[in-house]
Amino acid sequence: MDTKINLLSIVFSFRNEEGNIKPLVNRISTTMKDVKNWKYEIIFVNDDSTDKSEEILLELQKTYPIKIINMSRNFGIDPCVLAGFRNSSGDAIIYLHSDQQDP
């Protein structure tokens, strides 16, 4: 029986998503509780938000395995995804949209 614990890196880029961040983190946490032999990290790449997104993430970071990467300006999605991948520690990496519009 394989008992190796793997690490899954879940990457999100975002800009001004203060209303979506808490529900998103709760969904990820709930889902990952049922996944055996995997730990996870959530990497949020901030694409120059002007709302309270970063403040919310800093609070959630006290409870959840969250990394925050702040871009120096609004770079757009591709550089943010790349920054998230480069800062991941996982055995596997997935990218999802932070607005929760993916089915």
Regions inferred by a protein language model and the residue ranges of each:
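Structured catalytic core of nucleotide-sugar glycosyltransferases
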Residues: 1-103
